[in-house]
Design a protein with these regions (language model features):
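Long, low-complexity, charged/polar intrinsically disordered regions in eukaryotic proteins
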Residues: 1-5
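Nucleic acid-binding interface residues in structured DNA/RNA-binding domains
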Residues: 6-23, 28-124
């Protein structure tokens, strides 16, 4: 989820490095049509310290998804899911999906469609 003027508290260089680490981890999972949990993703980010339930992680994922979608690669963060329970992305993903023009009237359908789009792009 993106927030205007959000202060993440890191230098821009460190933030960008963390974003790239997260992006690469998600791409690796998408290439094999896989997914990654929020807690496993934050372990892959070493340039900055984030926790799985950190609002800064939400913003980082929002930036990545917006950039990837603008590049016609879909919302890459669709591969990041809860470890337990519904095994789907959190509510911030769907809020951003709506702002990017996705139909979220059926969350499961929205998620599956976006997951297929991202997997198809990266696995080819």
């Amino acid at each position: 989820m993106l927030r205007e003027g959000f202060d993440h508290g890191f230098s821009q260089a460190d933030w960008d490095a963390g974003k790239e680490e997260a992006r690469k981890a998600m791409i690796e999972r998408a290439k094999v049509r896989g997914m990654i949990t929020y807690s496993d993703l934050v372990k892959q980010i070493t340039s900055i310290h984030l926790e799985a339930h950190d609002s800064r992680l939400d913003h980082l994922l929002g930036e990545i998804s917006s950039e990837e979608d603008a590049a016609d690669r879909g919302m890459l963060t669709v591969v990041v899911v809860h470890k337990v329970g519904d095994m789907q992305p959190g509510p911030g993903f769907f809020e951003l999906a709506l702002s990017l023009g996705r139909d979220i009237s059926n969350l499961l359908e929205c998620w599956v469609e976006e997951l297929r789009r991202v997997h198809a792009y990266w696995s080819n």
